[in-house]
């Protein structure tokens, strides 16, 4: 998967914003490059010095907060769920994160890194999805966790 620079987008940021409610600066997925319905998805996030969190974490030695790496994985997991269903099944739906287990951080993510976010479905029952997520930079694991999320009706 180190050839991610050459991979074509399956879904760009405009398409992502049609499926996720997140918007900059909290939208943490730039594009989807691999997708197998109900199985797996790979997305990318370019980490730049312009990210607002680097102003305070940490000014002299900027490091992406681990919780935001998990959020990026959770957004990729939400995309996997919504892209796996028919458009009429996800219309007026939103994915809510229900839990995170086994989160581990292996190395810092710094400006200039490109996060590769890989999520896989481990179980799905009705509207509830369980998935594993692994974030990599240059092929090295930087974070991993298990996620549970639910597709629910959007409140109006």
Curated annotation (Swiss-Prot):
User: One biological-process term from Gene Ontology?
Assistant: lipid A biosynthetic process
**InterPro entries according to UniProt:** FabA_FabZ, FabZ, HotDog_dom_sf
Q: Where is the protein localized?
A: Cytoplasm
Q: What class of enzyme is it?
A: lyase
Q: What's its catalytic activity?
A: a (3R)-hydroxyacyl-[ACP] = a (2E)-enoyl-[ACP] + H2O
A Pfam family recorded for this sequence: FabA
Q: Name one GO cellular component term.
A: cytoplasm
Residues at the catalytic site:
57
Keywords carried by this UniProt record: Cytoplasm, Lipid A biosynthesis, Lipid biosynthesis, Lipid metabolism, Lyase
Q: Name one GO molecular function term.
A: (3R)-hydroxyacyl-[acyl-carrier-protein] dehydratase activity
**E.C. number(s) listed in UniProt:** 4.2.1.59
Q: Which CDD domains match?
A: FabZ
Q: Which family does it belong to?
A: Belongs to the thioester dehydratase family. FabZ subfamily.
Sorted alphabetically, which HAMAP family does this protein's record hold? FabZ
Q: What does this protein do?
A: Involved in unsaturated fatty acids biosynthesis. Catalyzes the dehydration of short chain beta-hydroxyacyl-ACPs and long chain saturated and unsaturated beta-hydroxyacyl-ACPs.
This chain's protein is named 3-hydroxyacyl-[acyl-carrier-protein] dehydratase FabZ
């Amino acid at each position: 998967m180190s050839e991610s620079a050459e991979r074509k987008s399956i879904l760009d940021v405009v398409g992502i914003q049609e499926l996720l409610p997140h918007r900059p600066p909290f939208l943490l997925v730039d594009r989807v490059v691999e997708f197998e319905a109900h199985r797996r998805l790979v997305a990318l996030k370019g980490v730049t010095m312009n990210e607002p969190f680097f102003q305070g974490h940490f000014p002299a030695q900027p490091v992406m907060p681990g919780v935001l790496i998990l959020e990026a994985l959770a957004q990729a997991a939400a995309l996997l769920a919504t892209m796996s269903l028919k458009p009429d099944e996800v219309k007026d739906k939103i994915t809510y994160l229900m839990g995170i287990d086994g989160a581990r951080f292996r190395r810092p993510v710094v400006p200039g890194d490109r996060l590769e976010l890989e999520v896989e479905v481990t179980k799905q029952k009705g509207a509830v999805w369980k998935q594993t997520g692994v974030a990599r930079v240059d092929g090295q694991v930087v974070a991993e966790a298990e996620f549970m999320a639910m597709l629910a009706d959007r409140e109006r």
